[in-house]
Amino acid sequence: MPGVIMDEPNVGGHPKGPSVPDSSRNGIPPLSGSDGAHGVSSAHNDGANRLNGSAKGIDGYKQNVDSSTTKIDFVGLRQPPELPHITQGFFPFSKLVNRSVQQCWNELSELITELAEVQVPPQDSGPLPGAPNGKPLGNQSEQNLQKKLRLLDFAHSKRAEFIKLLVLSQWSRQAADVSRLIDIQNFIRIRHQAYAGALQCIGDMKRDLVQAQVGNPDLKTALEVLAKGKVVSMPTLGYKPPRPLTAKGALKRLQKINRLISARLVLSDSVPTPFQTYRVHDGRVTFIVPDEFELDLSIGAEDETSQFYFVDIRFLFTPSSPIPKGRIFNELDMRINDTLRTKGLAGCFDLLHGLVLTTKINALFKQAAELARGLWSDTLRVELLHRTLVLQYWTLRPGPKSWLEIGIKSGRRSSENSINGLPSIGLRWIRDGQEVDSRDIEFDSKNLSMECILRSVIALHTSHILSSAFEKLSKHSLFSTGALSLRGRLSRTEPGACQLDVQLTRSRHLRVSVEPMSGTSILSTTPSTLERSDVDRNTDKPFADEIVSRVARLRCISAIEEVESNAKLLGFQVVNPRSLKLDFRRHFPANILRFSFFWHRSWERNWVLAATSSMDGDSWWVVQLQPAVPSESALPFDANSGISAPRSAQIVCNTFFPAPQHNMKSPFADMGHSLYGILTMQANARYLADLQSISFHPPLPQLVIEASLQVPDILIHYQALKLPRAFQVAMPAELARRSFIKDTIRLAFSGVDPHEKAAVLVAYGELLSPPNDVGALVSKQDRSLVLHHGGNKFAIRLLTAAGRSAMCELLESLQRLECALSILETLRRKKMQPQSLSLSRVGFLYGPRAELSANIDINLTTSSTHTIIDPLHLVTQEKPLFQLRLGIAFDYPNPHRRMQGSFTSLLNNAGATSSLGTVTGLLSVTLPLMQALDGLMANPSHKDPLRVQVIARNAKTFQIHYPMQKVRFQLLITQRPNSLVWVLREAGGLQGRSSEDQLKSRLKERLYHSKGDGWQGLENGVVATIDKVGNLLTELDKCFSGLDDIPILNQSPLETKPIPSKPTMGNTEPAASGNTVQNARLENKSPQKAAATHSNADVITID
């Protein structure tokens, strides 16, 4: 039985032997006076209670030794030997009980916890049904019943276990008897084994003694030999020794053997195909098997059926050594001869062919083991399985493994490279866990070199990896289009010669190779400028994909670093993407591996450049940020700059560096210039796209930098009448009759102004019907406008910051040009002589001899800062941004300079009689008058007192006031049936003044009832022609020239208020601000009156 459960807790002991017995054995106390060494025990009255004898400790044993020897010997003759006690597999019953109780408690606790988690629905408050015995049934829900059932099952199972424990407890009270039975059975088994062992030993001895038998000596024959020197009873055969062979005889015999061998091989013997190459010489035939061995055979009889005999063998491959003479050679000789006797030449070849193949594999195994212990340690694993050599290389590389198997192919498959189906050494190549063709492996069966085979395998593996990487890289547009070079060098025998040269940028190159021993990819750059470690490798990818990803990553890093270093030289600042709050993957393609953002101090802060690099190409992007709020600060971007997510991102160039040309001194500087221009053009095109009411070409996706780094132009469809209302300029009715500009405007980038640090844009256009010689009117110093001499083309120069739209300035300038051309046409129609032309002024000459000059100013004012207004807001805005106000200016000494305010008001009034034609007509009409007034004002000394005042109510009405006499006259233009005339009337001052009769009589006599050159009195006024009004004013002034001695009573200060030196430019004509006052000063002959008059001269003359 396997074990006994004892009721006592201290049961135990050594498994075998009575060396150190326990204090009790099998539950029986030891017997005193026993000797464990001799198996002797004392006789006691309680001997019936012990089993298998008893044992004592060592102390008891020593005590017994000191006892009487006679007693011990006597007792030893009577007592049986001590039996070994078996205690292996015994354990206390109390431990089983404790374990069972503990397990029961644990399971009960778990059950209570589980049952507590079960939710039992509450019992209904109604009357409960009673059981047959009259007791209530309680809660009869399914959950409650399930809980009760589980408790009942647990109690039943544990009850069964404790019943088993009870049975074991009752049985263990008789365990002592069972233990004694186990000890007896063990004793019997040991005795049986000793008996069987004795029999076996005797049989072996009997068998071995057979070889030790020696025959009895033949004393009789020995005595005869010693006495006579011979044995008479031994028969003789009569053989005669052969005669010694001479050289000639030996040669004849060898030649005869050669003939016999040749005849046999040709006529009778079946020579296998591998033995077809042979030569017969020196009485033997030498079979030659290329790359394997040379076999020498000979014959022992002339009979054709006799066998060949082995003579010698030589291996034809290296490394190999000759078979040493001795036991090995003899065994080979015997084995070959037996094969020749039984299987002939074919069997001999099969034997030796297999021997050679095995020898070659063993030689390769030894070489591989030496490599694994030498330079290839830790990277090479070698194993020989029967006759198959397994060589695993690149053991430290993660991922699928690669190995080479060199074994013997049976040759039964027709596809195998074997001769007539013979076995041969074959290669099986497992590359990255998959079997591939091994025919390209360099294997020399004659000169065996495991290192050459291994290097060939690694070279082919490396070539496969690099060629796969080459194919994957060549699919990217950078290499497929020839923008970057990609060249691979492969080898079948030398892994160090396998390289992949990749051009990262125009100045940086990368060489990819694989370290032969460890299989690690090596990437080296030229020049070596990449300092960051390449640690982010993905071991889950195939090796070729890993190389491609690393090459792509390094190429993009190199390209971005080179761009950043060149961009910083041009003043570009690298912008941290975090400060832009930019989700890069949302606005840019997913294949981009590296990117960088740039900004320049002269750009608007809502535009940046992005340089992106991928294996499909390097690109420049123009990124517009939102909100588009320009900033005056030129500080770098930060998180608090107020710029949020990008609004748009547009690719503008597909290369970082332009193709080098003979006229390029600094290619990247030219690229920076083009980037500056394309950003400016993109900003304007984006502004037009947002307006949605002005068409343009090319569209935004096609607005990119050209191959020659030329910034493309934008063609804008311009029609002033179809512009949004916010951009339209309200022209005067006379100027807005027709358009002067064709509807196509070409906007071109023309560089950067070094002083203003702004982009220069030029708008080119054509005139529909250009005036004659209009190009000569534009001054060469005016850089804002150029008109082609003798042609119909013009150009407008604009300055704007990069990233800021110039559309408002362009539309304003175009409408200014149309306004200037309309004014020019009107002047020529009015027979005026144009002198100059610009976007803000038109100069012309007038007068009888064109001796007077004037300038019409074109002033456009804006109601707000339109450069920061959202174009989407401008589309719906009805209020125009531009307010047109024309002005006219006269240079000194033009007499019309005193009428400048009146003419300006007349130009800007909305009345039907207010127009440029009216003003030009009034210039001719009022010129004689203004010249006459200038004559009245001639006062070189500027010391004479104030004598006359002229107030211009408007360009057609004047008031002449003599303050000292308090007399006013009104001079105005009146239309007669055939012409215009000036009419002079009294405006007040002479009625009811008797003291001024002399003045009245003078006026009537000289003016009202008189007639002069170009004028005529009308009794109550005077009328004068346009060109002779000066004569009238001269005669009028003469009427007052002789009145200096006439006293004027009740003289009061002048009622006229001081007039400002420059009139107010208003739309109406108030008397105080819109009039022009002209003062004439005449000589005063009375010093006292001159002083008094001078003290009261507080009227300011407008000049």
UniProtKB/Swiss-Prot annotation:
Q: Where is the composition biased (Polar residues)?
A: 1073-1103
Where is this protein primarily located? nucleus
Subcellular localization is given as: Nucleus
Q: Which domain of life is it from?
A: Eukaryota
Keyword Hydrolase listed: no
Q: Which Pfam families match?
A: Med14
InterPro entries from the UniProt entry: Med14_N (IPR055122), Mediator_Med14 (IPR013947)
Task: Give an example GO molecular function.
Answer: transcription coregulator activity
Please name the GO terms of the biological process aspect recorded for this protein, alphabetically: regulation of transcription by RNA polymerase II
Example GO CC term: the record gives: mediator complex
Question: Which residues does the annotated region (Disordered) include?
Answer: 1-63, 120-140, 1054-1103
Q: Which UniProt keywords apply?
A: Activator, Nucleus, Transcription, Transcription regulation
Family (UniProt) = Belongs to the Mediator complex subunit 14 family.
Subunit structure, as described in the record: Component of the Mediator complex.
Q: What does this protein do?
A: Component of the Mediator complex, a coactivator involved in the regulated transcription of nearly all RNA polymerase II-dependent genes. Mediator functions as a bridge to convey information from gene-specific regulatory proteins to the basal RNA polymerase II transcription machinery. Mediator is recruited to promoters by direct interactions with regulatory proteins and serves as a scaffold for the assembly of a functional preinitiation complex with RNA polymerase II and the general transcription factors.
What is the protein's given name? Mediator of RNA polymerase II transcription subunit 14
Organism lineage = Eukaryota, Fungi, Dikarya, Ascomycota, Pezizomycotina
